[in-house]
Curated annotation (Swiss-Prot):
Origin organism lineage: Bacteria, Pseudomonadati, Pseudomonadota, Alphaproteobacteria, Hyphomicrobiales
Protein name: Tetraacyldisaccharide 4'-kinase
Any one Gene Ontology cellular component term annotated for this protein: plasma membrane
General function of this protein: Transfers the gamma-phosphate of ATP to the 4'-position of a tetraacyldisaccharide 1-phosphate intermediate (termed DS-1-P) to form tetraacyldisaccharide 1,4'-bis-phosphate (lipid IVA).
Organism (species): Rhizobium etli (strain CIAT 652)
Pathway the protein acts in: Glycolipid biosynthesis; lipid IV(A) biosynthesis; lipid IV(A) from (3R)-3-hydroxytetradecanoyl-[acyl-carrier-protein] and UDP-N-acetyl-alpha-D-glucosamine: step 6/6
Record bears the keyword Transport: no
Amino acid sequence: MISEAPPFWWRKADWRAWMLAPLSFVYGRVAGHRMAHARRASVSIPVICVGNFTVGGAGKTPTALTIARAAKAKGLKPGFLSRGYGGSLDVTTVVDPHHHRAVAVGDEPLLLAQEALTVISRRRVDGAHRLVAEGADLIIMDDGFQSARLAIDYALLVIDATRGLGNGHIVPAGPVRAPIGQQLRSATALLKVGGGQAADRIVRMAARAAKPYFTASLKVRGDDRLTGIRVLAFAGIADPAKFFRTVESRGAEITVAKTFGDHEHLSEDEIGDILTTAERQDLLIVTTSKDFVRLSGHHGKAQELAQQCRVIEVDMVFDDHLAPGLIIDRAIVACRERRLREMKTKS
């Protein structure tokens, strides 16, 4: 799966999108067929998948964290399941946030592991069974909606209200991962993040398909203001512009903005450039939680940068504060129904 979205994907379709359209047709046919017809393995506990329609960030990880907190408030033991993208380990592993580094397990799993039991696995079915063995009673998948490997009881698709579906084309002509119709049929509900209008069309399509949708927004954690402070902001995430807007919303003046690839581990030269630039211009360094965990556990310049960073942490806040609990309850009911169907089939 492509993880880096070229800029033209997020603009009106141009000659590049149309030139790649034949490849998109083939890719879409394969992806749609897999989602519709693949045999999915089953586990004995509820599975919630937090996915999205497109390649790139939409807020899946903050959403997964919010659902996990709601699960713990209900007395459940949630477990996160991640592929561990960006990490080097290719074996099923329980992530230890005090031992592992992002270079081994990926940045998002490290963030998830700070909240709840987290397993990474290139084979999601193996990872799900490991979570069951570790005592989890609810699995929250961070991504993996289109993989069609594991039976899902509740599929929540997150869509950014500012970016929407981009140019609307399927990979590689655009950011869409599979035919929208098939994705909607496989989804349980949508979560629209932010106040833009780019997601309105897909929300209307979901409504016609009788799919409920929730609304939410990313809120900066705490009351820390940066009013009037000149900063160097850097981000290696799918949508760095969103982070820069968040920094400015705190009152900061972004004097220098540096962007890197999603999940990218910075080189010594890149780190040195950030440190030197900030010192020369007397700038406060600010970054994202994901970028910070990629620096954690290292020595030398990476450690120095981590010590100097101000981390802007955000939470996914549902407009209806009862929504995360409702999602969990419906996943539990759906799991019971799935298990009953499986028992009848076996008998």
